[in-house]
Each structure stands twice: as structure tokens, then as C-alpha cells.
Amino acid sequence: MFAPHSIVCLYLGNLMAGADTSSPLIESRADLIEAMERGCKPEAEWRIGTEHEKHVFHTNPLRPVAYEGENGIRALLAGIEKKTGWHPFYDGENPIGLRNDEVAGGISLEPGGQFELSGAPMADVHGTASELEEHMRVARKVAAPLDIHFLGLGVTPLW
């Protein structure tokens, strides 16, 4: 049997995820298994996707990249948009990412200043590897003249 707070957490989690509030309350292990099984896809529809965050920085002087300016994040996004044809999305007037509408992938600027590839759903890890390789090839090509570099690190460096 689940502890009462576990049931509340599952219920609140469903609410936050936009689930129908008339869904039956999960009160037992069997209820939980049944709910999870309803959400499963057939194996033929299984996909894998990439989430790849990297810090963006300049080397001279060593510092994070500002949003504005001729060598900033906005310029990086504009250059990648031009190379890929992906569509920008905005926070107010400011582009904060690009969407690839053909395959449901994109690039976004994260709150800590990281640059993130949210990959398209792929049939296997080889597809994600190819997608990441192409993303980095384009990003580096656009970034090089801007003196922008990338660092895949799980914590923010001390600049």
C-alpha cells in the first residue's frame, strides 16, 4: 500500500502535467501499474532524444557570452537560423531559441545561459549521435568568427 503522501504526490503530479482531474485516484500498486501501462507505447513507436547543454564563452577575455552585441547569443542564434532555416521563438522581442518544425527538435537558451539542443525523437542512438554531430558542426562554424566556444559541463564554471 502507498503512503498517503505518495498518493497525493502522484495526484498532484498528474494535475501539474495537465492530466484530466476526473482520472481515478491511484490507491494501490495495481492502480499504479495499470496507469503506467495505459501510457506505454508499442515497442515499434519507442524513440530516443538528445538533451545536450553546453556553456557558451569567449576566450579573450575568458567570460560567458552576453546576449546582446555583435559577438553575443543573439548573433549566434541569428547565424544558426540562417544556416539551418529553423524558426526563432521569442521572449518578448528577444529570440531565445530556434525550432526545427520538420523533425520536432530545436535549440534553446537556458536560464543559466547554457545553449541546449533538444533533439528530435530518433529510432536509435545512432540517429541522436548524427544529429548532435551536425548540430555541433553548424554551431561551431557559426560561433568561430564570433569568438564563441562551447563547454559541456554539468556545473557553471567560475569564470
Kindly label every feature range from the protein language model.
Residues 13-159:
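Terminal catalytic/cofactor-binding subdomain
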